[in-house]
Amino acid sequence: MIPELMVQQQVENVWQHMVGVICLNLTDRKQVKPVLTELFKMTPTPEEFLRVWDHDTLSDFIKPLGMFNIRAHRIMRMTHDILKWDGEDATKLFGIGKYGSDSYRIFYLNDIPTDVTDKQLKKYIAGIK
């Protein structure tokens, strides 16, 4: 992944986007990018991900990010959810809150929320206006 770009600008699908959102929670993107690059190389889709990973192996893999048990749980649950998700409200996906919803709206729905609070998303919005 390119260091200057946001993770959201470098993923191939909505599932990867949401995994990135979960991994970025309380963690700098410089730590997250190498882990996601390897994860998505091995399993680029949610279906492939569920065939390869379980909670324990994922926890070990994402250990460098910290909070690895919590993140693994959220990623596993979100991945199951996304396979049934209607693509509307991102907060219906397990582990996805306001930041994830705002990010999804910006990058996938071309809808700029007026109440964005995340500083990186604000910077991105300012740059596209």
Give the residues covered by each predicted segment:
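N-terminal polyanion-binding entry modules of DNA glycosylases/AP lyases
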Residues: 1-87
